[in-house]
């Protein structure tokens, strides 16, 4: 959704999903710190791809946290539907956002080059 309304919907859904994850999800598998970086809602409002950054001790903890989010998708969808007034509530699809990890890796490479 590239138009102004689409951007507003993306931002509103991002804000609400972030709040729901922070305050209402009580899954014990969700041990990683979760940050919702971006949301892309399709034009027909059927799907919302939610990109999350997971800060965890190891990869196993990240995987468990992502599984917990995916299993909570129905609850999150219902809560978003109650908070955001849309024609239809989009189905929530979680994707891991590795952009922060990639940026840190590139920065470490640049620091190594700088040292040489």
UniProtKB/Swiss-Prot annotation:
Molecular function terms from GO: ribosomal small subunit binding
InterPro entries hit by this protein: KH_dom-like_a/b, RbfA, RbfA_dom_sf, Ribosome-bd_factorA_CS
Alphabetic keyword roster: Cytoplasm, Ribosome biogenesis
Subcellular location as annotated: Cytoplasm
GO cellular component, one term: cytosol
First-listed, main subcellular location of the protein, grouped into a coarse class: cytoplasm
HAMAP family: RbfA (MF_00003)
Entry-linked PANTHER family: RIBOSOME-BINDING FACTOR A, CHLOROPLASTIC-RELATED
The family this protein is said to belong to: Belongs to the RbfA family.
Identification of the protein by name: Ribosome-binding factor A
Gene this protein is translated from: rbfA
